């Protein structure tokens, strides 16, 4: 009986850790979608042309690139738990700064900081997820990424509601900031202590370009192409709907919300599909679906096919 209670206690503790990490994936999904769903409003507020908006949107990847060299160092030095909490809080705070931008310069600075916090948060969150997955002893990573997409889907719907009620962007983003602080504060104590995890780590071989299989560069190129398509949906779907598809105001964000909903389903089903059909076949089918979806949206710029 004692053993059974002990096992139950361990299982319950592990489940709490998984839920906490899942919540830390969900929050940035909501935060990012809040920004992405209001891009047309920010564009209109600052009187930006499509060309100017495209230039401004480069600020996020610039911030990610600037932080890339430091994120791993910070997580290793201070632990993923501390860096995750810090980056998620700052990520939501920067979102509020984006909504409060009154000049293009202010917006660009905010978006650079947004990208920097996103990169640090990605490293810290995935580190926590890897630790939980190791404890479970089976592949659960896609479910965490699915929670990010679910957050994006939810954030897109929330953004559409705020936009359709004509509430100011700073009120919308301020509400998301408050909710983010609440969730981060509740989940903090259930995150994994890195010091405890590091004590169990084995020696890891040092990185060397000589040991890299050339096929990894091809996979990296494929990943880049996938992220390029993904970024197009994130940054331009709402603008495309508002300027080309031109549906009723209530449906301007329909494309973004539909894309995030489909991504959520795909990520939750990914582990099962890969196990059943193999990664190569799934990759080919997904590539074809991406190509077909983008072509359909561009060739038939109407509400139903574009969505």
What are these regions (language model features)?
Residues 33, 60-69, 152-153, 260-268:
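Residue-level signature of mid-helix packing/kink "hotspots" within the transmembrane helices
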Residues 37-51, 235-251:
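Short amphipathic helix-loop junctions that connect adjacent transmembrane helices
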Residues 47, 79, 100-105, 246, ...:
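Helix-breaking motifs and short loop linkers at transmembrane-helix boundaries and internal kinks
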Residues 66-105:
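Conserved MFS/SLC helix-loop-helix module at the cytosolic interface between two early adjacent transmembrane helices
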Residues 67-80, 163, 266-279:
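Helix-to-loop junctions at the C-terminal end of transmembrane segments
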Residues 82-96, 281-296:
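Structural signature of the two symmetry-related core transmembrane helices
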Residues 106, 143-192:
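Helix-loop-helix hairpin linking two adjacent transmembrane segments in secondary transporters
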Residues 111-147:
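Cytoplasmic helix-loop-helix junction between adjacent transmembrane helices
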